[in-house]
């Protein structure tokens, strides 16, 4: 993860390489070294994160496929966000895991550029699909009539994926297979000095973290205001209903209007607030996981005296990787019926197969018994015919 777009000194701090940051052609005199104990811990944690991300998001996609409410708007965005998290696991966590095992990149230049490109594609997609889902929840609360256009959702998701593919294109130019020491090659970034690293890391931080967080904060600010407004409306409607009941039949129309307003507010507070809570927790997990990583990157490029300890980069990278496997557990917490349906479907299929195999065995056993019975009767009749009759 730290190698997805990080400058060379980030990789230098983690891997222990002494290659100068952003320079081409300068090499170290001795072979590169690294902290093997720290590398083993990183490999173990990344392996666990990869397993949880693959299994969790695969279960979410399978549950969304088998549910009866698969055409729900929220489930549509959850499906694409799970696909993006799978992309992060396969194209970002897995290459980083293999890279930590081998220490150096072993592959052609084309593979180096492709891996670096796909690493950032998954990161962009996960961020902006989360942003898209939050905007959808904001529209569902603030403007429910406009949120009913499903075709617009599909176009927005398609545009998001295409935009992520385009925004990740600079990775192909920046990273390449280069000689970082005498006879040692690695997938390395080369920037124009001295402003290149600052410009690129700042742009990535703005595009993937700061701007999305600002938009997400605005969305949930509007959602909070709308919820507060509806709660206030509910209180006023309840008071109007009570006053209408006290005044009698003369205020019957006002009482009915109050009841309608109350039922409308209850609908918002029960049917939509739960989904808003879920997306808010997903956003909060995104902020918690990615803040140390981007803070460390920005500190490294803008402060020449910033510490470059390997442990700090490792912790920030592992925390960022954790975001790809925590979303399925959040989905499970707020939409538990999805996984209950999946478990029930699995148990039903297993029971049917078991019952079918038992029925097959029973039918075969019955056929064997009937065939044995026929043979025994036939043999007994033959014995009775062969015996002489006695008077």
Swiss-Prot record:
Disulfide bonds join 112-187. The chain crosses the membrane at residues 39-63, 75-97, 114-135, 155-175, 203-225, 278-296, 312-334. It comes from the Eukaryota. The modification Phosphoserine is found at residue 370. Residues 1-38, 98-113, 176-202, 297-311 are extracellular. Pfam families: 7tm_1 (PF00001). Residues 64-74, 136-154, 226-277, 335-391 are cytoplasmic. It is a multi-pass membrane protein. Its main location: membrane. Signal peptide: none annotated. One of its GO terms (molecular function) is vasopressin receptor activity. SUPFAM superfamilies: Family A G protein-coupled receptor-like. GO terms for cellular component: plasma membrane. It is found in: Cell membrane. Keywords: Cell membrane, Disulfide bond, G-protein coupled receptor, Glycoprotein, Membrane, Phosphoprotein, Receptor, Transducer, Transmembrane, Transmembrane helix. InterPro entries: GPCR_Rhodpsn, GPCR_Rhodpsn_7TM, Oxytocn_rcpt, Vasoprsn_rcpt. CDD domains: 7tmA_OT_R. Glycans are attached at residues 8, 15, 26. One of its GO terms (biological process) is regulation of systemic arterial blood pressure by vasopressin. Receptor for oxytocin. The activity of this receptor is mediated by G proteins which activate a phosphatidylinositol-calcium second messenger system. Belongs to the G-protein coupled receptor 1 family. Vasopressin/oxytocin receptor subfamily. This is Oxytocin receptor. It comes from Ovis aries.
